[in-house]
Each structure stands twice: as structure tokens, then as C-alpha cells.
A protein has these predicted regions:
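Short, exposed beta-strand-loop hairpins at the edges of beta-sheets
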Residues: 174-192, 196-200
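Residue-identity detector for glutamine
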Residues: 5-7, 31, 86, 117, ...
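A structural detector for beta-sheet-dominated domains
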Residues: 57-59, 79, 163-167, 175-179, ...
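N-terminal targeting signals for Sec/Tat export/insertion, comprising classic cleavable signal peptides
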Residues: 13-40
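Mature extracytoplasmic domains of secretory-pathway proteins
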Residues: 32-62, 98-170
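Intrinsically disordered, low-complexity N-terminal regions enriched in serine/proline/glycine
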Residues: 13, 19-20, 65, 70, ...
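Mid-chain, structured segments of secreted extracytoplasmic proteins
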Residues: 52-93
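Sec-dependent signal peptide cleavage junction
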Residues: 1-14
């Protein structure tokens, strides 16, 4: 299968995806995470880099993983979400352990596209992983942002998949026609065990 190119006039669904995946993202290393008393159905962790307070919604696996805290030596990958919980600065998932050593792990990124005439093109490049532990949120967001900037994702193509293939034979798939599900934003994988990444 190859990425199918969408019509020039994007549907509102793709406009929303383009708007989300071109938002600014923030990365903070070696943080302390403080737990907040629950006031809604979702619990939150506070991180306070640079005197700003960011609240991170604990969803999916994070809900059981983070109990009372505080937690030190955590990295956070933050994309500010719409104001769903009466909060101005909140993000979902993206919490990982700080590296114990330097990581420079290069993997092959292969992009296969099919244009309106049915011509198939393939682009192969290197993608650098710098984390021992990386969240699906960070991988999904950075890869889609790169696809938007370099390959006009959501401009002339709107469907397809990103597949993260692991050395042990496992794989993780992101479907390009929808935003990554919130519970998966908390999923964390071994960055050094990524074998290659395919987009098609």
C-alpha cells in the first residue's frame, strides 16, 4: 500500500490534523513531576521548567504507573491541547525516563508515495533517535511534522500509515487520517530497539 494523495481542497478533518501537528512542541529533560489532587476524572502531574507550570494528563498506562510521587529524572514531550479540563497549559502523555547514557541511534526512514497519475516514488533518509526511552507521542508528532514540512502531508496527501518496526519483530502503527489516540500518547518504547520506520 502507498500513501494516497487527497484532493487539493482539504476536508475540515485534515485541516484540524494539519493545525494540530504544526503546533509548537516543548521538550524538557531531568524534570521533577509533582502529582496533583484529582479534581476531575483524569489525574495530572505538574512539571515546572523555566518557572512555567505544565500539567500533564495521566492517561493509558501512565494512570497506573504514576501514583503519589514526586518523580525525578523524567523527560517530558509537551504539545499543548485544547482547553478540555478548564486548563490553559496542559498536555497528554509523553513522559519518559531521562537517558542514563548518550544515544545517537540512526534508523532508516522510508517514504513511499503514489501521485494522482498512479506514479510511485520512494524517498529514503536517516532518522535520528536520541532517547533510550521514547514515547509514541513524541515519535508520532515529530514524524508527522516532518512529513507536513517536507512532503506536504495534509496538503496533497491525507491517508496512509507510519509504521515503527522494532528489531524484535514488533511494530507500532500510526494512522495518518486521525490524531494519535490519547491513551497511546502514554505508551513508551525502547528507542534503541527501533529498526526502521516506513511511511506508506
Amino acid at each position: 500500500p502507498t500513501i494516497k494523495q487527497a484532493q487539493t481542497d482539504m476536508t475540515p478533518k485534515y485541516e484540524d490534523l494539519r493545525a494540530y501537528y504544526t503546533k509548537p512542541s516543548f521538550e524538557f529533560e531531568k524534570q521533577f513531576g509533582f502529582m496533583l489532587k484529582p479534581w476531575t476524572t483524569v489525574r495530572f502531574m505538574n512539571v515546572i521548567p523555566n518557572r512555567f507550570i505544565y500539567k500533564i494528563a495521566l492517561v493509558g498506562k501512565d494512570e497506573k504507573k504514576y501514583k503519589d510521587g514526586p518523580y525525578d529524572n523524567i523527560d517530558v514531550f509537551i504539545v499543548l491541547e485544547d482547553n478540555k479540563y478548564q486548563l490553559k497549559k496542559y498536555s497528554v502523555g509523553g513522559i519518559t525516563k531521562t537517558n542514563s547514557k548518550k544515544v545517537n541511534h540512526k534508523v532508516e526512514l522510508s517514504i513511499t508515495k503514489k501521485d494522482n497519475q498512479g506514479m510511485i516514488s520512494r524517498d529514503v533518509s536517516e532518522y535520528m533517535i536520541t532517547k533510550e526511552e521514547i514515547s509514541l507521542k513524541e515519535l508520532d508528532f515529530k514524524l508527522r511534522k516532518q512529513l507536513i514540512e517536507k512532503h506536504n502531508l495534509y496538503g496533497n496527501m491525507g491517508s496512509g500509515t507510519i509504521v515503527i518496526k522494532m528489531k524484535n519483530g514488533g511494530k507500532y502503527t500510526f494512522e495518518l487520517h486521525k490524531k494519535l489516540q490519547e491513551h497511546r500518547m502514554a505508551d513508551v518504547i525502547d528507542g534503541t530497539n527501533i529498526d526502521n520506520i516506513e511511511v506508506n
